[in-house]
Amino acid sequence: MACARGTVAPPVRASIDVSLVVVVHGGGASNISANRKELVREGIARAATEGYKILKAGGSAVDAVEGAVTVLENDPEFNAGYGSVLNVNGDIEMDASIMDGKDLSAGAVSAVRCIANPVKLARLVMEKTPHCFLTGHGAEKFAEDMGIPQVPVEKLITERTKKHLEKEKLEKGAQNADCPKNSGTVGAVALDCRGNLAYATSTGGIVNKMVGRVGDSPCIGAGGYADNNLGAVSTTGHGESILKVNLARLALFHVEQGKTVEEAAQLALDYMKSKLKGLGGLILVNKTGDWVAKWTSASMPWAAVKNGKLQAGIDLCETRTRDLPC
């Protein structure tokens, strides 16, 4: 397959049978340093494999995206959960969301501090409350009520994120977040054997952000969207730009208009870039299992599993493929 700029998609399907599909991303960002690339590649492949295992075992699309994103939240190479970037005060504030395309159920949390896996809390918001979104202290109180253990913030902070904040302060000055060099987010989309779709997105946000800043990741329609009639999307990139164009739902609008997944992703990202100069990326799977990973940022770690075949990459036209054990 020829590789266009920032685009990865599988070969054309041979049939319209529902296939199990998981696609994950590790965030649209500036170029990843050579000494981290293999760790990032391994982490993203591990997450996709975990999501696919859940589907193979009969789990739902929601189970799969939660499982895949949890793997990435637990990996310090990614900006979510353990290893989240720090705000202007050197603290962690994390956001996450999840959505079930079967009935449009959704849950989200923002500005949570002492939770190792915000995606799990977002799912509990979806399933255990009448609400879609909890934030800050309210979200943390809900986590306590649900029996989710609190984790001291210092245990979620890494030496790399401390150095990242110091470097950002020196280079840009506090609060200057117009065009962050690292807009790392993690996300997953999945299609299960019952034809249900889901997405999940999780992030630590933008390094050196103002206290209380919330980006696109927990916002349904911006950070992600899932509808069984259309597809599932998880986005990454400059959060303020993604919010302004409602990037996830915009991509699915183009699917609704009859565009292929690749065309839909390209149109949505091009609009954000032309209108706002906003860079980013997205992963999308439609109701028949066609998927795409597309980005306008310098790189976007991604991995996908379909029909037992794992594909993964980071940079343009750099894809590794292997068969998973049966």
Swiss-Prot record:
PTM per Swiss-Prot/TrEMBL: Cleaved into an alpha and beta chain by autocatalysis; this activates the enzyme. The N-terminal residue of the beta subunit is responsible for the nucleophile hydrolase activity.
UniProt-annotated catalytic positions: T185 (nucleophile)
UniProt record, GO biological process: asparagine catabolic process via L-aspartate; proteolysis
Gene Ontology terms for molecular function: asparaginase activity; beta-aspartyl-peptidase activity
PANTHER family the record matches: ISOASPARTYL PEPTIDASE_L-ASPARAGINASE (PTHR10188:SF41), L-ASPARAGINASE (PTHR10188)
Family: Belongs to the Ntn-hydrolase family.
Protein name per Swiss-Prot or TrEMBL: Isoaspartyl peptidase/L-asparaginase
UniProt source species: Mus musculus (Mouse)
